[in-house]
Amino acid sequence: MRSLAISAEGMSTQQKFLEVISSNIANAETTRTPEGGPYRRQIATIGADAASGRATASTITDTRAGRLIYDPGHPDADKDGFVAYPNVDINTELVDLMIARRVHEANASVFQAAKSMLRRALEI
């Protein structure tokens, strides 16, 4: 039973990664946020709850500078005509997406194998 819970927890954690990556991709060109300035890339991290030992997913904001593109006609251009774009690199996000997908698939395989073993044990 524990193996089912562990793999389900792993899939749930990877879901958080997928949500963060999706948000980054969706906001890759967002130059204005309610907080002001361009969107900042979010990074999902995994930690462990000391009391329960369970994995926890959280997000942090990537503080690296984004791209500056000269576009004096853009509504968000500064006095010199530059627009600050998010610090999101689509290629990085796509690689992270593939990794998260593979980890999710691995957890799903473990879940299916554990379920199959439990069924066989109940037949005995």
Go through each PLM region and give its residues:
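Amphipathic alpha-helical polymerization modules
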Residues: 1-124
